[in-house]
């Protein structure tokens, strides 16, 4: 960010990233490398606002190296369609007062970019992801899949830019 005199950086949906090799969390017969959300990098402590109103479905502190750190998942209902949004790599303090079932208004501060020591050891950023079906998961859902799993995961996790509408600004 400093080299480009930028306040924020954006990482896109469906990017095939080799940087996940740094964590055993993404290892296996076939390494997970395909990104399922949008990342927004910036200074630790940057406020995170709810993109849509919704109910707190679940939250967790996913503390493994390379994981999300503090994570919040909201449940949304638009007409007859229910879906979730995941906010990852937040500050641990952000989940200390949450409770499941609480309503969050659109534009409400729901978190802050966490420091590396609490966000999975990543540079401070937000991972934002849309998820149709959580398959009974609470406070966590894969943000990266293998190439061979792409069709299933991309079908369940549409491009988060459908909500954020910000990739048009990426050069």
Kindly give the residue locations of the regions a language model identified:
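Terminal peptide-recognition signature
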Residues: 40, 54, 74, 107, ...
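Zn2+-dependent peptidoglycan hydrolase active-site motif and core
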Residues: 50-94
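Flexible, gly/ser-rich surface segments that form the specificity/activation loops bordering the active-site cleft
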Residues: 57-71, 108-125
